[in-house]
Amino acid sequence: MRVFIINAYEDRKEKYDDERYEIFPAFWWEDIEEEQVAEYHFRHNARLDYRKKVVACSLSHQAVLGKIINEDLKDVFILEDDAIIEKWDRLKELKGCKEFCYIGGQINAPLMKDFKKFEDIKDSVRENFCKGINVIDPKEFRLAHACGYFIPNKRVAQDILSNIPNCKKERAIDTEYISLQKKGKITKFIYPAIATLYLPEAKKGFSYSTYKLLDDQWLY
C-alpha cells in the first residue's frame, strides 16, 4: 500500500509529517508553457494563471498514474495537498476493491447549470448512500474534485490514462474523471469520505471560487 500526496506548495508539507504519506512533487504552474495550455479547453474568460494551474494539476495526477504503471504499484491512494487522512484504519475498507474508487470529493448535480438547485436536495441524495463502497449514479449526481481516490493496480491506472482526454481538447482532471463516470469507467466511491479537506488550505485553492468549499466534505 502507498499513499501519495501531490504536493505543489512547500509550506503545505508540514502537515504530512506522518511517514505513511509519500510526497509526490507536483508540476509547478509557472513552468507550464502556453503551448501546453493550448491543448486544454477553458472558458473564454479564464485567466492565464488559472489555466496554467489547471494544466499543472492535471499533469501531476497523470504523472502519479504513470508511476503506478511503470513501477507496477498496487493499492495506491492519491491525495491532493489540501486533503488529509484522519482515520488511517479505514484504508482497509478498500481491501479487495479492483477498480478506481473515490475516497473523497464533492457530490454535485449531473449538470453544472443545476448546481444551486442541487444544494437543496443534497441531503436527500445522501440518504441513499450506505456506509462503505457505493455506486455513482451519473443520472442523479456526479462526484467532483480529485482530492482523493484509490487505484488498485497498473491495469486500472492504464485504463484511466488511455481514456484521457475524453474530448478533442483536454479538461481539468476532475472534469475528465466526471466524463469517465458518465462512460461507466469510474463507478465507485466510499462513504463517508476517508480523505477530507483541510479547509485552511482548500480555501486558497484555485478552484475554490467554483465549488464554494464550506466544509471538509466528510459527507461529500
What does each of the following model-derived ranges do?
Residues M1-L79, A83-Y220:
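An acidic/histidine-cluster motif and surrounding catalytic segment
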